Structures are given as C-alpha cells and as structure tokens.
C-alpha cells in the first residue's frame, strides 16, 4: 500500500510541473530561446517534425535525447539557477542552436 501511495504522489508531482515545448524541424529549433522559471523543476516536451532524426543535446546540463521523425518525448529538468544554458541539435549543429534562460 505504501508503494502505491508513493507512485500516486509522484504522478501528482509530475502533473504540477510546468511544461515547456520545443519543436525541432529541418535543422531548426522553434523557439530558439526557452524561458523557464529558475529554481523550479520543469518538463521539456521535444517534438521532431522534420524528415530525419534530431537530437536535443546540452553539454552544460548533461542532457541528450535522440528523436526519430514524428516522435515527441519528454525530459525532466531539476531546478536550475538563474542563467543561460546552451543546447543544440547534434545532427544540425550549424542551424540548430538554442538556449534555455532560467529567470
């Protein structure tokens, strides 16, 4: 019973997280700048609408996510200090540059 309560409380906490959306399409990121609340856990929903694979990667934040065409996946970020954090599409490094700004 305790395990069930832990699962239920974890699901409730996940539902309370803000969700930020990022679209990856044809080597471009939309939007290129994501503003997130500082010191708040959040979910990043990443969707690849391009014809080929895309990869969300941030060396600073130690996050990496490969997406096949048409796939949507989520990453959960722990609270971040105020600042700017770079990320990129590893398959399109020239055009797929973005940043997360925690305020």
Describe the role of every protein-language-model region.
Residues 1-3:
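Sec-dependent signal peptide recognition
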Residues 15-21, 67-103:
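Extracellular/periplasmic metallocenter environments
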Residues 15-41:
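N-terminal edge beta-strand
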Residues 24, 46, 58-60, 77, ...:
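Residue-level recognition of conserved beta-strand positions in structured domain cores
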Residues 25-32, 60-61, 70-74:
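N-terminal post-signal-peptidase region of extra-cytosolic proteins
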Residues 32-52, 72-80, 86, 102:
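Beta-strand cores of secreted/periplasmic/IMS beta-sandwich domains, seen most often
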Residues 49-69, 97-99:
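Histidine- and aromatic-enriched segments that form or immediately flank copper-ligand environments
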């Amino acid at each position: 019973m305790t395990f069930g309560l832990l699962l239920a409380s974890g699901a409730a906490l996940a539902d309370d997280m803000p969700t930020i959306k990022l679209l990856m399409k044809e080597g471009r990121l939309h939007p290129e700048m994501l503003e997130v609340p500082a010191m708040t856990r959040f979910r990043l929903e990443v969707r690849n609408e391009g014809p080929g694979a895309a990869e969300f990667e941030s060396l600073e934040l130690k996050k990496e996510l490969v997406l096949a065409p048409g796939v949507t996946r989520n990453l959960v970020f722990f609270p971040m200090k105020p600042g700017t954090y770079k990320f990129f599409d590893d398959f399109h490094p020239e055009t797929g540059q973005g940043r997360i700004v925690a305020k």
